[in-house]
Amino acid sequence: MQKLSKFTGLIVGPFLLVISVGALAHGDVTPHPVDTSSLDPIGAEWVVPNPYRGNEKAVAVGAVGYLHNCAGCHGLNAVSGGVAPDLMKLDNECLDLASKVKQAACMKEADVYFKDITLNGKKNGEGRSTMPGYGGVFTQEAVWAIKAYVDSRTLEERGK
């Protein structure tokens, strides 16, 4: 019986070690580049508002970029699980405005906010990073494609 227990320990111990290391690796926040080669290039100069809003090809590219870089914290299909802010709420106030001029100005502000946080990350009041910055990895096309995806999900959830 004693030998069986040692044998079991020799088998189960390394297995548990591998599983625990895998669990720790699950929280990987390494930015993954987004393939935007199918999109029209925007250029080096940052453009606001999002030039890809409503562009179906950009939405598809953004969906893949979102899945690989954002879903772990912000939720699958942009449906927040409560870990990080609900990105679909970014544009809700804008979409509720009656004036199209005010709505456009509000959406432009939301785009700037999204771009700045995406590129530079976010820290809490204690200086701890609560979101990594993707400025070293994401192109302008990637940022706007992901925002186009989030915008499309917002409209879809609102039934528009």
Across the structure, where does each feature detected by a protein language model lie?
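Short pre-active-site segment immediately N-terminal to redox-active cysteine/selenocysteine motifs
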Residues: 58, 66-72, 77, 91, ...
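N-terminal signal peptide c-region/cleavage motif recognized by signal peptidases
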Residues: 20-22
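Electrostatic cytochrome c docking/interface patches
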Residues: 31-65
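Primarily secretory-pathway and cell-envelope proteins
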Residues: 73, 105-108, 146
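Classic N-terminal secretory signal peptides
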Residues: 12-18
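Axial heme c-ligation environment in periplasmic c-type cytochrome domains
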Residues: 25-32, 52, 81-90, 117-154, ...
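Gly/Gly-Pro-rich "capping" loops immediately C-terminal to redox-active cysteine motifs
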Residues: 59-63, 79-119, 137-138
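Bacterial N-terminal signal peptides that target proteins for export
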Residues: 2-12
